[in-house]
Amino acid sequence: MTAALTAAPTLPPPELRDCPAPAKLNLFLHVTGRRPDGYHMLQTVFQLVDWCDTLHFRRRDDGVVTRTTDIPGVPAETDLIVRAARALQQATGTRFGADIAIDKILPMGGGIGGGSSDAATTLLALNHLWGLGLPRAELMRIGLALGADVPVFVFGENAFAEGIGEELTAVDLPDSWFVIVHPKQHVPTAEIFSDECLTRDTPLSIIAVFAACTNKFSFGRNDLEAIATAKFGEVARALEWLKQFNQHARMTGSGACVFARFPDEQKAQQVLKRLPPEWDGRCVRSLARHPLAAFA
């Protein structure tokens, strides 16, 4: 009897364009402790929104990974995009490489996860383009080594996060419109987390308490906000400006972006039209799932 031949897996076309890397908002962010290795223990809820960088990938057969777009201040060798691609190569032993271009829209140092989201989109897109078929949990493990915010973008859903941000539970959040204000000030994450005045003992909450909250957008607080607004005056000014329209406005991540939820797009656009000209702002809509969630 002739043995049946096993066909090699069929690869997708060599080019994958217009891959979104969405921003995230931290609806609250509690610092609950600090590990011996220096990482902070957190509780937060991640909300994905439709403000995105866009990445483009072309498969190579020689194993070379290149970033074809220049990003001022970010050398290709240290870029999370390139590091993510190489981490995926190392984890799988694939012979493939990639040319990667990016339309960089999300501000760096904004607290909206731009670099982490770019890394996650790279992992998801190349998992597909290289025909690897890795499960989501494995991509999340690879992503965690790149940064604590990478796993939630690979996870692909809005999530209640614990640990250093990698212990994720999906949460249902209402369809929402937000105004995000970027006061054009770069806030270094390490500077905020290392500040001696940072509170690191916020009591633990449980997901059921958040789920039962009638207004999930006023739950808790951002423990990093007081530090960032004391150090960076434009962040403080932007937050106070936005609180004119929604008293529950708050900072996302370690800043510099601040945000508030509004009843509908019309109201959000009305607020955005009053934005002081020295700042950038966006009207964005919530996402229920990551646009590339099907790639894992």
Swiss-Prot record:
Q: Which domain of life is it from?
A: Bacteria
Per UniProt, what is one Pfam family of this protein? GHMP_kinases_N
For this protein, what reaction is catalysed? 4-CDP-2-C-methyl-D-erythritol + ATP = 4-CDP-2-C-methyl-D-erythritol 2-phosphate + ADP + H(+)
Concerning SUPFAM superfamilies, the annotation shows: GHMP Kinase, C-terminal domain, Ribosomal protein S5 domain 2-like
Q: Give an example GO biological process.
A: isopentenyl diphosphate biosynthetic process, methylerythritol 4-phosphate pathway
* Listed InterPro entries: GHMP_kinase_C_dom, GHMP_kinase_C_sf, GHMP_kinase_N_dom, IspE, Ribosomal_Su5_D2-typ_SF, Ribsml_uS5_D2-typ_fold_subgr
Pathway(s) this gene product operates in, as recorded in its UniProt entry: Isoprenoid biosynthesis; isopentenyl diphosphate biosynthesis via DXP pathway; isopentenyl diphosphate from 1-deoxy-D-xylulose 5-phosphate: step 3/6
Active site: residue positions: 24, 149
- Where ATP is bound, by residue? 107-117
**Keywords on this record?**
ATP-binding, Isoprene biosynthesis, Kinase, Nucleotide-binding, Transferase
Q: Which molecular function GO terms apply here?
A: 4-(cytidine 5'-diphospho)-2-C-methyl-D-erythritol kinase activity; ATP binding
EC class of the enzyme, as a word: transferase
Q: What is its EC number?
A: 2.7.1.148
Q: Which family does it belong to?
A: Belongs to the GHMP kinase family. IspE subfamily.
Protein purpose: Catalyzes the phosphorylation of the position 2 hydroxy group of 4-diphosphocytidyl-2C-methyl-D-erythritol.
| Protein name listed in UniProt | 4-diphosphocytidyl-2-C-methyl-D-erythritol kinase
Organism of derivation: Cupriavidus pinatubonensis (strain JMP 134 / LMG 1197) (Cupriavidus necator (strain JMP 134))
Q: Which gene encodes it?
A: ispE
